[in-house]
Amino acid sequence: MPSPFFAEEKDIPENQNVGNKRWKKLIKGEGSDDGKEKSSDDDDSSSSTKGLFGWRGDTSSGNLFDFPNTLTDVGETKQIVDATTIVDQLEAADLGAALNLKLSFLKQDFDELPVIKKLPDNLNDTIVAKSDNLEKTSKTNSTFYKDNGDSSEKQGSAESKNSPKTQLKEIFNGQNGDSGNLGKLAEQLQKTDSTKMEARSQTWQLRNAVSLKTTNMAQSDENYLLLDAAIPAFETSSQSPQSSGTISGSGALVNLTSTSVNLTQQKSSTTPLNQRIVRNSTGVKLLALEGLLYYVVGSSNKQQSSSSTIATSLAQNQSNNNQEQEINSSLQKNLLKFRAFQAKN
C-alpha cells in the first residue's frame, strides 16, 4: 500500500527513494534500521511489526489510530515517535510532500529532486503552496485550514520588507545557502510559473508545515491543505479566558465546515503519553499528544454559521487550577503545529 503522497516506488530511482522506505518502515512496519525485513518473531507482540497500522481501527468517520498509553519498548516506541515527530529532519514527510507536489502539480520528471535553499530562522522552514485548483487538492488526505493572509500585505500596494512573502522572494534571489528539505520545496514552488500555485512562507507559529493554500472562488475562502507529518510540542498558555466564546470564521485559522474545534487537557498531571488520530476523507479529526487531547466535534449550535469555528481549551493556569479558555487568533495558529502522518483511508 503506497503512502497517500509518496510517489510509486517504481517511479523513483533507488538512491532517491527515501519516502517509500520510511513509509514502509514507520507506517507499515516493514523493515528495520539495518534495512532487513522484520519477522513475526522479532517481538512477542505481532503489532510491533505493523507500524502505525498496528493500531488502526476502522470507524464510521474514518481510520482511528490508538497508540499505546505507555511507550516502554524500544522498537514500537521508536516507530511511533519517528512517525509522529519525524525526528530525522522531517525527511520522509518533506520529501514525500515535495514528490507529491511535483508529480501532481509541477509535472516534473520523477527523478528530479528540488534544489535546496535555506530559509531565515524567523520563518522556520515553513512553506505554503497556493492553488486555485480546489477540486484537485481537496482529493488528497489532508486537513484544511483557513487564514486571511499576512496583514502587512493588505495595508497597501507596497509589501512590507518583513512580510513572509517579501522574505521568501529574497530567499530565492540567492541571499542564503542550501539547507533542508522544506527549503527544497520552497525553491521548487517558487520557480513554478503557474497561476494555479504560489509559494508562500508563514510565521513561526506555522513552522515546519508544508501545505497547499487553495482558493474556493465560489465562497471566497482560502484554505491551507496540510501535507507533512510532524507533530511538535504544543505551547500551552496561561492567559486569562477571553470574554467571548466564539471566533468568527474570518478570524479563525481552522476551517472545518459545521464543526467546532475543542482542545482539552487531561486534568491529571500523571496522564501517560497518549496519541490518537482519527481520519476521514477531509483529514485529521482527532489527535492527542502528551496528555493534551485535540479533537473535532460537530457543532450543536444550529445558529452557528458553517463558516465559523469555536476553539476552546482546558488549560492549567499558574495557580494550578483548571480553567477553560478561548483560543484567540494567535493561539489558534499553534493548531497548525499539530500534524498527523498522512495515513491512507
Swiss-Prot record:
InterPro entries: DUF3713 (IPR022186). Disulfide bonds: none annotated. Residues 154-165 have a biased composition (Polar residues). Residues 27-39 have a biased composition (Basic and acidic residues). Residues 1-58, 139-165 are annotated as: Disordered. It comes from the Bacteria. Belongs to the MG307/MG309/MG338 family. This is Uncharacterized protein MPN_438.
